[in-house]
A protein has these predicted regions:
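A generic structural signal for well-ordered alpha-helical segments
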Residues: 58-59, 154
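Gly-rich Lys/Arg/Thr-decorated short loops/hinges at beta-loop-alpha junctions or inter-strand turns
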Residues: 29-37, 97-108, 261
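Cofactor-/ligand-binding subdomain signature composed of acidic, glycine-rich
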Residues: 1-40
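A short, well-structured juxtamembrane/interface segment
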Residues: 43-58
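Short, basic, glycine/proline-bearing loop/turn elements
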Residues: 33-43, 109, 134-137
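Glycine-rich phosphate-binding loops that contact phosphosugars or nucleotide phosphates
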Residues: 66-203, 210-216
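Short, amphipathic alpha-helical interaction segments embedded in low-complexity terminal/linker regions
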Residues: 32, 212-299
Length: 299
């Protein structure tokens, strides 16, 4: 399929005169188009759930979440990977974002990088990809060579491959074990896939990474117990998490956080079971980091 035939390159009939709209009309028109995104993502719920279950299994075995993409898609992958570290307390090497053209491409376009089929393979080789890993290929157009090459190499290694596109029958879907196609329709500004397509990809990545982390026990009830209290805001959040999940006062939560060496999960277990820090850590390790499982077994 030629690029001009992709739905992401079609002109949107609802925005043909956006250049003559009032500012308020522009805002309302863009918002109206954005409302289509959640519905398009929702139509892919079964595929997204499949992706979460499969990726969670690999991650539990010690694998990594590796995102590959170009342009906006690549930047969204890098963003998702980066956010998992402070949010869930995982090691930086467990979530990696690769963008065609490298770090420079995060801030400016690197001409020709996305069209290099072998570049994606080279980038993955440098990570020493294994069958335990999950590679998530992102391409709004569904055809970016950098992503295709990455997925092909990942398949050869035996890694789990997931493709996220915003067109039907995407090329990258045929190069992945699981294909997710959120068809959001023509963009407000023709071909500007940083808009609806980018929003859809971000929503899907939110679901996948959050789901995988939940299944690793990084969430207790609905709070992020893996949060790293590295600044004042996060220390306050950690104390509130401990307080609201255990019922202790804020001052008691602060003391528990200190006694647990700033480990929210350990602090909760110490409070709820009366165990020492060392015992709490051992229980948590045996339960593969699942706080709920520890508390259930030690009522």
């Amino acid at each position: 399929m030629n690029i001009k035939d992709l739905i992401t390159e079609e002109r949107n009939p609802n925005t043909m005169n956006i250049d003559s709209m009032s500012t308020l009309e522009m805002v309302r028109t863009i918002n109206h188009e954005d409302q289509k995104v959640a519905a398009a993502v929702g139509q892919q719920d079964q595929q997204i759930a499949r992706a979460i279950d499969a990726a969670a299994k690999r991650y539990q075995q010690g694998g990594r979440l590796i995102y590959v993409g170009a342009g906006t898609s690549g930047r969204l992958g890098v963003l998702d990977a980066a956010e998992l570290v402070p949010t869930y307390g995982i090691k930086p090497e467990r979530a990696v974002g690769l963008i065609a053209g490298g770090k420079k491409a995060m801030l400016q376009a690197v001409e020709g990088a996305e069209d290099d089929l072998e570049l994606g393979q080279q980038d993955l080789r440098q990570l020493h990809l294994s069958a335990k890993d999950t590679v998530i290929g992102l391409a709004a157009s569904g055809r970016t060579p950098y992503v295709v090459g990455s997925l092909d190499f990942a398949n050869e290694v035996g890694a789990l491959t997931i493709a996220i596109a915003c067109v039907p029958n995407a090329v990258i879907s045929s190069h992945a074990e699981i294909g997710i196609e959120a068809v959001v329709g023509p963009e407000v500004i023709t071909g500007s896939t940083r808009m609806k397509a980018g929003t859809a990809q971000k929503m899907i990545l939110n679901m996948i990474s959050t789901g995988v982390m939940i299944k690793q026990g990084k969430v207790y009830q609905n709070v992020m117990i893996g949060v790293q209290p590295t600044n004042a805001k996060l220390i306050d959040r950690a104390c509130r998490i401990i307080s609201t999940t255990t019922g202790v006062s804020t001052s008691e939560a602060m003391t528990a956080l200190h006694n647990s060496a700033n480990d929210v999960s350990v602090a909760i277990i110490m409070i709820e079971t009366g165990r020492s820090k060392a015992d709490a850590r051992n229980l948590l390790a045996k339960a593969h980091g699942n706080v709920a499982a520890v508390l259930q077994a030690n009522k």
